[in-house]
Amino acid sequence: MKIVLATGNAGKVRELSELLAGTGITILPQSDFGVPEAEENGLSFVENAILKARNAAAHTGLPAIADDSGIEVDALNGSPGIYSARYAGPGGDAEANNRKLLKALEHVESSQRTARFRCVMVYLRHADDPSPVIAEGSWEGRIASEARGPGGHGYDPIFEIPELELTAAEISPAEKNRRSHRGQALRILLERLQGR
């Protein structure tokens, strides 16, 4: 089955392709079709994921999977949340976002730097699908005091997994996929799709 992935984020394309290996599902990035980015003007992860999936399905005529995800920091009342990709401004510069978040927490004790990655994933059979399949995953951790690790993307270098004392950028892609919010959401989504 071919499904368009509603993102221009190469890290997400790579991560989801790895997670879907062996399922019989082929992910085609929306960039292969020249699909413009959807305007993410929803007020929640669910709304933004649906907007992105509808946009990709409408432009390609294919079923679509979209996710909206972000990091929620308890000491910042859940921010950056849905604004995670553009926390430091438009353009989605991951290093700038990480610097801004570290600066916002520079006087916050390690024990108070709890955070979670949250992912909402949506599947639409077509652009007018009235019954989107929605799945959610979350990954608890804390914000490190500095960026560490060569892997991952986005906030991974500053998201620390307390039981490992490593950031998401310091663990293997396979370990990350096993633990991550996106991996959880995709596994739930696949279970729900098989039940349809």
UniProtKB/Swiss-Prot annotation:
Annotated GO biological process: nucleotide metabolic process; purine nucleoside triphosphate catabolic process
Keyword Magnesium: yes
Active site, renumbered: D68 (proton acceptor)
The protein's enzyme class: hydrolase
Reaction catalysis annotation: XTP + H2O = XMP + diphosphate + H(+); dITP + H2O = dIMP + diphosphate + H(+); ITP + H2O = IMP + diphosphate + H(+)
Keyword Metal-binding annotated: yes
InterPro entries: dITP/XTP_pyrophosphatase, ITPase-like_fam, RdgB/HAM1
Subunit comment: Homodimer.
Domain of life: Bacteria
Pfam families documented for this protein: Ham1p_like
This protein's name: dITP/XTP pyrophosphatase
Enzyme Commission number(s) from the entry: 3.6.1.66
Cysteines engaged in disulfide bonds, as pairs: none
Any one of the GO CC terms: cytosol
Molecular functions (GO terms): dITP diphosphatase activity; ITP diphosphatase activity; metal ion binding; nucleotide binding; ribonucleoside triphosphate phosphatase activity; XTP diphosphatase activity
Residues noted as binding Mg(2+) in the record, renumbered to the chain: E39, D68
Organism: Thioalkalivibrio sulfidiphilus (strain HL-EbGR7)
Binding-site residues for substrate, renumbered to this chain: T7, G8, N9, A10, G11, K12, S69, H153, G154, Y155, D156, K176, H181, R182
Names of required cofactors: Mg(2+)
Matching CDD domains: HAM1
Recorded family membership: Belongs to the HAM1 NTPase family.
Functional summary from the UniProt entry: Pyrophosphatase that catalyzes the hydrolysis of nucleoside triphosphates to their monophosphate derivatives, with a high preference for the non-canonical purine nucleotides XTP (xanthosine triphosphate), dITP (deoxyinosine triphosphate) and ITP. Seems to function as a house-cleaning enzyme that removes non-canonical purine nucleotides from the nucleotide pool, thus preventing their incorporation into DNA/RNA and avoiding chromosomal lesions.
Lineage: Bacteria, Pseudomonadati, Pseudomonadota, Gammaproteobacteria, Chromatiales
Co-factor remark: Binds 1 Mg(2+) ion per subunit.
UniProtKB keywords: Hydrolase, Magnesium, Metal-binding, Nucleotide metabolism, Nucleotide-binding
